[in-house]
């Protein structure tokens, strides 16, 4: 009989967290990852659930997520250790019927709790559910090195950073035509940064936290990971270009328009019209 540790969603979390650590995005206990599940995903594994699931109240009610299950990374847990002991480092939680709190159904052993960024994740899930008609299921936060570096040297403006990332790699406009949001620096792990992130998630699938990291969303673990990976690759190119003296030539506005038409995407207007 298959156990929950062999379920697709546990194995998927193991792969995503391991890949992110190998990328260098999630040092120590940095980063967090949540995946929204259907009841049908977890129903076959009820025998593996805790006999007395712990209940934790949310800092604010989230009725849109009522009766919804998630698999989440734990607070203070190292991504590099998820593959070694998923039961200690991951947890399946289910929001209660009025969205006021959640039960820990599986995992997070030894009184562990979900990531401290759970407010930002849950608020962002709410916005991405509305923005994508329920298609987006993953929220991923990590410390992508080159994206962080760019927030020190580029103007921290959504349209400007979006345009530069589009220019850093041709595929970027195709992968994230909705652009990149960016917040002012804020204290992590608070409702305030969660609300600000969620507000930008209404318009963008990527949101930068300057001098800290990035939030990405997507319909699957692969898509969310790939989104961040694509932006980070462009950021790496830009870091090298700026270190070599800056751009001598780049992808033009006309070429970006042609790219959008070819792949049937609508580029973020403010970034496209920033300059020729």
From Swiss-Prot:
The keyword Lyase applies. Binds 1 zinc ion per subunit. Its main location: cytoplasm. GO terms for molecular function: metal ion binding; rhamnulose-1-phosphate aldolase activity. SMART domains: Aldolase_II. Belongs to the aldolase class II family. RhaD subfamily. This is Rhamnulose-1-phosphate aldolase. It comes from Enterobacter sp. (strain 638). The gene is rhaD.
């Amino acid at each position: 009989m298959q156990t929950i540790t062999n379920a697709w969603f546990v194995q998927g979390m193991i792969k995503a967290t391991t890949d992110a650590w190998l990328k260098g995005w999630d040092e120590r206990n940095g980063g967090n990852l949540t995946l929204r599940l259907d009841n049908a995903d977890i129903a076959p594994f009820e025998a593996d659930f805790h006999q007395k699931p712990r209940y934790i109240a949310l800092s604010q009610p989230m009725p849109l997520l009522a009766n919804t299950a998630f698999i989440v990374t734990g607070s203070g847990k190292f991504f590099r250790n998820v593959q070694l002991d998923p039961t200690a480092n991951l947890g399946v939680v289910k929001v209660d019927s009025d969205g006021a709190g959640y039960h820990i159904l599986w995992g997070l052993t030894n009184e562990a709790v979900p990531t401290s960024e759970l407010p930002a994740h849950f608020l962002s899930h709410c916005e991405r559910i509305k923005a994508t008609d329920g298609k987006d299921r993953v929220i991923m936060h990590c410390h992508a090195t080159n994206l962080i570096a760019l927030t020190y040297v580029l103007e921290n403006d959504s349209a400007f950073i979006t345009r530069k990332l589009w220019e850093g790699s041709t595929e970027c406009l195709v992968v994230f035509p909705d652009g990149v949001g960016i917040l002012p620096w804020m204290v992590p792990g608070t409702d305030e940064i969660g609300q600000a992130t969620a507000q930008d998630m209404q318009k963008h699938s990527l949101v930068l936290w300057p001098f800290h990291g990035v939030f990405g969303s997507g319909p699957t673990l692969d898509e969310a990971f790939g989104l961040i990976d694509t932006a980070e690759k462009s950021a790496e190119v830009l870091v090298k270009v700026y270190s070599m003296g800056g751009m001598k030539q780049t992808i033009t506005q006309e070429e970006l328009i042609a790219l959008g038409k070819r792949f049937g995407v609508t580029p973020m207007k403010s970034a496209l019209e920033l300059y020729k």
